[in-house]
Amino acid sequence: MTYPERPLLHLLTRTSLVGQIIVGLIAGLLLASFFPAAALKVGFIGKVFVSALKAVAPVLVFVLVMASIANHKQGQQTHIRPILLLYLVGTFSAAVVAVIASFAFPSSLVLASHPGEMSPPGGIAEVLQSLLLSVVDNPVNALISANFIGILAWAIGLGIAFRHASDTTRNLLSELSNGVSLIVKVVIRFAPLGIFGLVASTFAESGVEALKGYAHLLVVLLGCMLFVAFVVNPLIVFLKIRRNPYPLVLTCLRESGMTAFFTRSSAANIPVNLQLCERLGLHEDTYSVSIPLGATINMAGAAITITVLTLAAVHTLGIAVDVPTAILLSVVASICACGASGVAGGSLLLIPLACSLFGIPSEVAMQVVAVGFIIAILQDSAETALNSSTDVLFTAAACEAEERKASAA
């Protein structure tokens, strides 16, 4: 049956979501180029979309994890441990790539501006302390402030408690999870409009003029992220699944990375990743935990940002760096990156911590942070796209490897 009287509705239902997002992206660029005043006004649509994603993500994670654990049957296997290992290996590998690239293509900064009133963490111990305090946060406050470490802790605890509840209670949790998931699907259907508003307003406000003075630094940063996305991550996945990893890599970048690039929020992209995992047919008990956990600790992009900007400051100040110190920086950057979600300002405000390894004073380090905020239009977008798409990639790789191992047994 055809509906000639509704061609627009017919086109929307027949075109894939990714295709619609690409159309929204192009339309946003065109509007920003020719009608910048109008582009600034439609930015409100993008803000509404990101706010909707951020609003639904904490509730989705809480309900989904709690229902998944409560309904977990004895004997079912989850694959969280190998995924955690992949997260750590991926983050450390990204830091090593950033160190090598920074030595091969050293960047110089113009350190003159100040980013204003900020409070970077004082050391690694403070970052770890912040993470621990996040675990024992009040559950209501965790939901309100989108503290996903706290949300996970309470969801896991309640899920374990509800495993001893009646079948009626556990079925209610499953129905609640399905209801929240349906709301998420509705929100995600508005992604093309959201991307249109975000792209239009971003390019109308900043354009590319503000980035020209930092072209070399951006090339190193984005080059590292692309190298990790298309070389390092596929290599890690290949070692895990023993087949061509690129179909899976490209699917994750297309379906997850593209949305994350424009929302610039790993938390906002959690619903997108969970839906992608469902379409890939992954183990729900696994991905319902690994995806929100990955949004918190899987930070390859943050490790690259911290390392590249720190070594750019080191090169600018003429500080000599030996190999052991570079290795130590990789470790520190990896640990800092894992704690980036627990720090207001994310990876950029952890740069002073890494700079302290080289005796760089806080005043200079905060000027490096200011440079980070100037290039954040691209740096933050690319960082989030790499972080978020890798969550799905490593989850899928671990699930496939464990399934292959189980079938061979």
Swiss-Prot record:
This is Serine/threonine transporter SstT. The keyword Nucleus does not apply. One of its GO terms (biological process) is serine transport. One of its GO terms (molecular function) is neutral L-amino acid:sodium symporter activity. InterPro entries: Na-dicarboxylate_symporter, Na:dicarbo_symporter_sf, Ser_Thr_transp_SstT. It catalyses: L-serine(in) + Na(+)(in) = L-serine(out) + Na(+)(out); L-threonine(in) + Na(+)(in) = L-threonine(out) + Na(+)(out). The gene is sstT. It comes from Pseudomonas aeruginosa (strain ATCC 15692 / DSM 22644 / CIP 104116 / JCM 14847 / LMG 12228 / 1C / PRS 101 / PAO1). The lineage of its organism: Bacteria, Pseudomonadati, Pseudomonadota, Gammaproteobacteria, Pseudomonadales. Keywords: Amino-acid transport, Cell inner membrane, Cell membrane, Membrane, Symport, Transmembrane, Transmembrane helix, Transport.
